[in-house]
Amino acid sequence: MPVKKIMVVDDSPTERLVLTDLLIRNGYVVVAADSGEQAIVMAKQELPDLILMDVVMPGMNGYQATRTISREEATKHIPIIMCTSKDQETDRIWGMRQGARDYLVKPLDSTELLAKVGSFN
């Protein structure tokens, strides 16, 4: 099934808006969350086809939310791409170990982002 609904998780309203606008202009339905806690709740309610997850957020960070979403029975099938400024190899490895399927470093290149999103079609 092609990716149609994407959840954008980022505590920055600007980042959420930029990603949401890019994805909508490219034919995707977008839902957004501003925290790890909200992402977990919304993942169960919305059942998106893909999640773009920031790492650095107050409260529950993106690694913790990814681990929870990727282990919950109702949501473990949803692929997660980490989108973060944390660019060290150890950060990428840790993200993948928490259940992320891919990892993009900010600032995001829109062409690369759309290619990665499209690879889940």
For the regions a protein language model found, what residue spans apply to each?
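Charged docking surfaces used in two-component/phosphorelay signaling
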Residues: 17-25
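Short hydrophobic/Thr-rich beta-strand motif most characteristic of the beta2 strand and flanking loop
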Residues: 27-34, 42
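Active-site beta3 strand of CheY-like receiver
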Residues: 46-52
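Receiver (REC) domain active-site loop signature in two-component systems and cognate sites
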Residues: 57
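Short, glycine/charged-rich "phosphate-handling" switch motifs in NTP-dependent
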Residues: 101
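C-terminal output helix
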Residues: 108-117
